[in-house]
Amino acid sequence: MPLYVTLAVCALALVCLGAAIAAIAIGKHVFTRTTTHSTVAMGQPVRDGNFMFTADKMKCGIHQIGTPDDFQTPTGQFCIVSMKIINVGKEPAIYADSIQKAFNPNGNRYTADTPAGYYANSDPLVFLNEINPGNHITVQIVYDIPNGASIDKLELHENPYTKGAIVRMPH
């Protein structure tokens, strides 16, 4: 067997070994995703990964967020969900509004409007800081949905690879 073939096979083996070590070190949740969700009503806590989420209230029909001089306007209407998030795990975790999904009764999915979220939260760094175990944050998640539409449920995640938890929203 030529030397370059032997070297290529060895390099491939090292890459595979590195991937296996990374999978063990990082954890299997990075490479897998299940579809089973915990489901609760608004106001009840629900866990996904290291986070315990409690959606306390939702207000829709908002057409401006911010101050009179510095504001965001929606394409349709803003729906703002107030939520408490507790890190109930054993390691720090970062909250990201971009992975918190909302659905209307027909199953249409909406993503959070992060720029509007900066205006809605008194501490915009809430999106950038790690939440240590035992600590909590309170956030306002902002969705820009069509006028006349409603949010039926939220799908909440600690990170993009967790299974998610469902919160049914009142109509």
Language model segments and positions:
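Conserved functional micro-motifs across diverse proteins
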Residues: M1-H171
